[in-house]
């Protein structure tokens, strides 16, 4: 049996190693809070601060719903055992046990298998900064059950003090001491074993700016798969430097710019474009998003479905790996945590306008390999923004019923371009100009 076991292990390692950052560049990620996306039985009314019953089998049952929008990767909640009530998964108690609220180990393996059968890659959320809220009773945590595994007790109060950010507690959570060689080696061994054992395709890493950068070099090497790190900060230079230590980071500077542009002025986006060009080591791998579980939903901040649709389509066509937060396709509008973590059951409507637009935009992404096309900004003012990627002209608005004439482009005279989102909407280059008439939704023109 040993030779067979060895062959299987080698095959699994080859499978995992195939998920390179270059391949991830072509993927589009649907973010799931495992406890809130789909359940297999009616567990009653959902208390947003407690477990509500979502599980791995529920996700399996709804993979066609995800696939129908065109997503080919999912990001799920941390899978390890947590303190009771920590439905989100960020409060570790046992590094080596799976969270039983989400299902058994067989259920988790079944999810991975079902996703791969449908060519959906799985990204698992992981935490290496902190453990659950146990004060100083470290005996409740395994294997980090001693005070020597943690930094001395202090709270982060000054986010401009990097030493404090890395060595003190986020929201009172015990802060792991990566300077302890055993702690670092344990975390690195764990992530390597986890990925190999379950055929995980990528990882999302929580709270990276609260951990020394040298640690991420080691963790990245041990993981061996694509990583996206969360540096919750709007400063481009600050966030971009973490991409020197991980494959990718969530593009929070762009996230804030998207809100200020689609709910304000596109001059903000124009400024971001010129300011960001040389900042990220590899902007094509950064994660582009409009919403997530840590912030109020877009429609809570800016209650306009047209603007939201414009922002979402922009995020799918802009450079980077798109990440879309579950429930957005149903126009969820929750406020601050936990109200932005609504259950999705009974709302799997495949007929919403955004569900259909997501499907069409994803089809275009794949047809033209949009990730390989350079971005050229073509027009920007307060209410209109346009860029091209190859033969695609993407036009966006943050208002209603406007007309613009684009003269800075590379399409030849007489070229016909048609909007892939709505049939019959075509324009042609005339006199070197392209006349665009916008409603309240984006227009994605493709050369015919």
Annotate the PLM regions.
Residues 325-328:
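Short acidic/histidine-rich active-site segments
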Residues 177, 300-301:
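Second-shell loop/turn segments in exported
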Residues 20-28, 33-198, 213-231, 236-238, ...:
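Substrate-binding/active-site clefts of carbohydrate-active enzymes
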Residues 9-17:
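Hydrophobic h-region of N-terminal signal peptides that target proteins for export
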Residues 112, 116, 189-289, 303-306, ...:
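Active-site-proximal helices and loops of the catalytic beta/alpha 8
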